[in-house]
């Protein structure tokens, strides 16, 4: 139990040390205080979603896709799930050594309702180790197409909420770059990504725009905001999607128009389904 200022009551000091949020002697330095601020700010967005699912009375399942070292899952368990007599967190990761380390840490901490699965995207959608429906899907700093993988997983699992912090959206930028000369003759909008730095930044932005449209086309209300304390990073965009049932009528059409206008037709399968 923690009595350290700045740390929420009841948090596991051992966990925070394992996650390098606390130093080995249980102290907060400037860097770890920044990390803690980031974690708590992200939790501020996720906690109401957890409460929403819990209030429905049908249990609570959360899958962290591309979990890495599963620090988000551990923090959520420590702050929310630990005090409950129900709920389960699944960490999905393709690197077996990280899955094993997370499993060992959960056992050591007594976090009994956490599972760590060494599965690919396609495997995770159909694996019997996961329930047919997952309430909340998270993907933190999921690189390149990993955010899209998490969205596909969330849609397949009929998730009530998705919480996404995308990272390194390089694929769309590479397609913009490949067709740059052709685009110059097609649309004046190509000026938006003419310099290489603009290609990278515009590619990242349009990737997330297309992701939001995809979610809206599947009946989700989407909000996009900035994470406080992550300003030093380009990876500070937070996408939260909550299922409402009514699809935005023109979302699919908008996606198709954007892909065509920007010479990204080859990415249709990734963003329109």
Place the predicted regions along the sequence by residue.
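Phosphate-coordination loops involved in phosphoryl transfer and adenosine-cofactor binding
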Residues: 59, 86, 134
């Amino acid at each position: 139990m923690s009595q350290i200022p700045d740390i929420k009551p009841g948090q596991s000091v051992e966990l925070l040390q394992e996650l390098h949020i606390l130093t080995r002697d249980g102290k907060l330095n400037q860097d770890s205080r920044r990390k803690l601020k980031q974690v708590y700010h992200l939790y501020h967005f996720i906690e109401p979603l957890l409460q929403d699912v819990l209030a429905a009375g049908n249990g609570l399942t959360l899958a962290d896709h591309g979990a890495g070292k599963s620090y988000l899952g551990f923090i959520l368990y420590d702050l929310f799930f630990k005090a409950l007599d129900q709920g389960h967190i699944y960490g999905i990761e393709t690197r077996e050594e990280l899955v094993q380390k997370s499993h060992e840490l959960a056992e050591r901490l007594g976090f009994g309702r956490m599972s760590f699965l060494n599965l690919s995207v396609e495997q995770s959608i159909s694996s019997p180790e996961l329930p047919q429906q997952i309430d909340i899907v998270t993907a933190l700093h999921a690189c390149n197409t990993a955010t899209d993988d998490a969205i596909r997983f969330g849609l397949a699992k009929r998730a009530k909420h998705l919480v996404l912090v995308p990272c390194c959206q390089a694929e769309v930028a590479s397609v913009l770059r490949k067709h740059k000369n052709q685009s110059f003759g097609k649309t004046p909008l190509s000026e938006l990504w003419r310099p290489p730095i603009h290609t990278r930044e515009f590619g990242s932005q349009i990737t997330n725009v297309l992701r939001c449209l995809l979610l809206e086309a599947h009946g989700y209300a989407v909000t996009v905001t900035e994470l406080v304390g992550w300003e030093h990073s380009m990876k500070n965009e937070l996408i939260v999607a909550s299922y409402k049932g009514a699809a935005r009528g023109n979302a699919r059409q908008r996606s198709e128009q954007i892909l065509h206008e920007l010479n990204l037709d080859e990415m249709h399968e990734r963003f329109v389904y």
